Design a protein with these regions (language model features):
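RNase H-like, Mg2+-dependent phosphodiesterase core
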Residues: 2-246
Length: 246
């Protein structure tokens, strides 16, 4: 049977759930959004849209809410508000959940070549689709962090700031972030001087100075504005851009 991908739209009822959550001062994610859905629910998020170097990585996570560990309920959150140590601890716990059948985890990525060819948004959506493809099961509905989602062979709903609201999306954000950071730290010894062991490819002053001094590697995103400026030799402007947040 041919399945037509449903056009992504905000999840019905999500705004009401969010209002209730905020109204009672709740700041941690939970399963409230998942409970509004029918069937097998998958959370999707990505990491690495902003860096100057490295892939964009996405994760798709399905959680069994009935067996989800109490420890993780108190610790799991949007990866951006967790420390590196907290992210790593949550990642290990999620992997243990997967080993016990409490979670299913799929990870996908798009390379720098694909980022330069497609643009970063399309590459991120491609990584999301790849993550879902390796889950091993097709979800009935995918909850995607943000306002834009890839076409999938299941119902798709976007949830703005979903990584702070939904356990499934928060789990995906942690898996994607930790996976990408590990990739960049693994590349760091092969490309000394760029500081990837700490900046993981993001635009920092150290990274910008290294690019001016050492040049661009095959892992840098040549389509990004600072890379184009470096190519044409506009180093003062490049340094200003690379030193600030992207």
């Amino acid at each position: 049977m041919h399945h037509t991908a449903e056009r992504p739209r905000p999840l019905a009822g999500v705004l009401g759930v969010v209002a209730q959550v905020r109204g009672r001062g709740k700041t941690m994610p939970d399963f409230a959004i998942e409970r509004q859905c029918q069937g097998l629910v998958c959370g999707i998020d990505e990491a690495g849209r902003g860096p100057l170097a490295g892939p964009v990585v996405a994760a798709a996570v399905i959680l069994d809410s009935r067996r989800f560990p109490k420890m993780l309920r108190g610790e799991l959150d949007d990866s951006k508000v967790l420390t590196r140590e907290q992210r790593e601890a949550c990642y290990r716990a999620l992997r243990r959940c997967a080993d016990r059948g409490v979670a299913r985890i799929g990870v996908g990525a798009a390379s720098t070549v694909e980022i330069d060819r497609l643009n970063i948004l399309r590459a991120a959506l491609l990584a999301m689709a790849r993550a879902v493809a390796v889950l091993g099961v097709r979800p009935d509905i995918a909850l995607v962090d943000g306002a834009i989602a890839p076409p999938l062979a299941c119902a798709v709903r976007t949830v703005v700031k979903g990584d702070a609201l939904s356990f499934s999306i928060a789990a995906a954000s942690v898996v994607a972030k930790v996976t990408r950071d590990r990739i960049m730290r693994g590349l760091a010894p092969r490309y000394p001087g760029y500081g990837w062991e700490t900046n993981v490819g993001y635009a920092t002053q150290e990274h910008g100075e290294a690019i001016r001094r050492l040049g661009i590697t095959r892992h840098h995103r040549r389509s990004f504005a600072p890379m184009r400026l470096a190519d044409v030799g506009d180093l003062p402007l490049f340094a200003a851009l690379a030193a600030g947040p992207l």
